[in-house]
Amino acid sequence: MTTLVLIPGLASDAVVWRELADAAPLPSHAADLTRDASIAGMAQRLLAETEGRLVAIGHSMGGRVAMEMAHQAPQRLAGLVLANTGHQPRREGEQARRQRLIDLAHADIEQFADAWLPPMLDPARIGDAVLMAALRAMVRRAGAAVHERQIGALLGRPDAMAYIPAIACPILLIAAQQDGWSPIAQHREIAAAAPDAELAIIENAGHFAPLERPEEVTSAIMGWLDRRFGAEHA
């Protein structure tokens, strides 16, 4: 049976995909991205921790890990779900911007959360106390050291467009209307380059769409899983 590999993003954990894990008709494996210092290493570990055919479901940085899994072991990937992600290599000036956040996280993780999280969200959700508390708690659990290690992995990330055209498995891309960090255009570029991809756009959500709009994101993924793998879990 196919296993869903649920992959969180930067300074995140299994909470990102909790609603999907509870609803999914297939067994799932919660990925831990806290231990490796490269996207390739994260992908390699997840492939080693699992068996058989996989659908890798990644949010943000986790989407990059999912694509890398398909690059490393195409025979094992039955499908990919890529939410709020991107494909570009490191950009000019990115290292300095990231370093400022690394320094802030080491100085005060709460101040880091206050600086980093609001720009990631749909502006209408910044005042949502329950959502913000859940996100801040997740950042605290990750901590400054994990954040720094994961930033190092992101700064060394590959140009995924170099291998996206060779990913033969079906891909569901999930973009959010208010995501300024990973805009819809990036997802359209991935969809155009991949042999078999479709795009779902979530309204009233930013970069943390799986937590901002969990019902809508879960519904999009469940519908895609049913269309692509319905016979397997009927």
Residue ranges and their predicted role:
Residues 1-45:
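Conserved HGGG/HGGXW glycine-rich cap/lid loop of the alpha/beta-hydrolase fold
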Residues 71-72, 76-113, 119-120:
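Flexible "cap/lid" loop of the alpha/beta hydrolase fold
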Residues 169, 183-192:
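Short alpha-helix in the alpha/beta-hydrolase fold that links the catalytic acid
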Residues 58-62, 66:
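Gly/Ala-rich beta-loop-alpha elbow adjacent to hydrolase catalytic centers
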Residues 167, 173-175, 179:
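Short beta-strand/loop motif that positions the catalytic acidic residue
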Residues 90-93, 108-166:
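Conserved alpha/beta-hydrolase catalytic His-Asp/Glu region
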Residues 191-207:
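Catalytic histidine neighborhood in serine/cysteine hydrolases
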